[in-house]
C-alpha cells in the first residue's frame, strides 16, 4: 500500500520538532541531498554581481532639439544610415546603438549633444 502525499504531510505534522529534524537528516544522508535553501546561495552572489562595472551601454536619442540638420548629420555619422533613415530616427528618437563600449557611448553622447540633441546613456 502506497501513502499519499497528504498522508505523509499529516504524519510529519504529528511529529515533534526533534523527530522532524532527525527525519530531515536521515533523508539528506539517504539521498545525498541538502535541505539548505539554494536561494541563500543565489542571494549571496547578487551583491557581488552588482559591484561589477557596467561594460555595455545603450545610447538613446531622446530629442533632436532645434538643430535638426546637425543632429541628422551626427546620427548618420554614428549609425551609417542613409539620409531618410537618419532623419526619421532623429525626428522620432530611439535607440542609436546597443551594447556600445563606455568610450564609444561617451563619444556618441558628446557628438550628439554638441549637435543639439538630448541623449541618454544606460
From Swiss-Prot:
One of its GO terms (biological process) is translation. GO terms for molecular function: mRNA binding; structural constituent of ribosome. Keywords: Ribonucleoprotein, Ribosomal protein. The keyword Ribonucleoprotein applies. CDD domains: Ribosomal_L7_L12. It comes from the Bacteria. One of its GO terms (cellular component) is cytosolic large ribosomal subunit. Homodimer. Part of the ribosomal stalk of the 50S ribosomal subunit. Forms a multimeric L10(L12)X complex, where L10 forms an elongated spine to which 2 to 4 L12 dimers bind in a sequential fashion. Binds GTP-bound translation factors. Belongs to the bacterial ribosomal protein bL12 family. Forms part of the ribosomal stalk which helps the ribosome interact with GTP-bound translation factors. Is thus essential for accurate translation. NCBIfam families: L12. This is Large ribosomal subunit protein bL12. It comes from Stenotrophomonas maltophilia (strain R551-3).
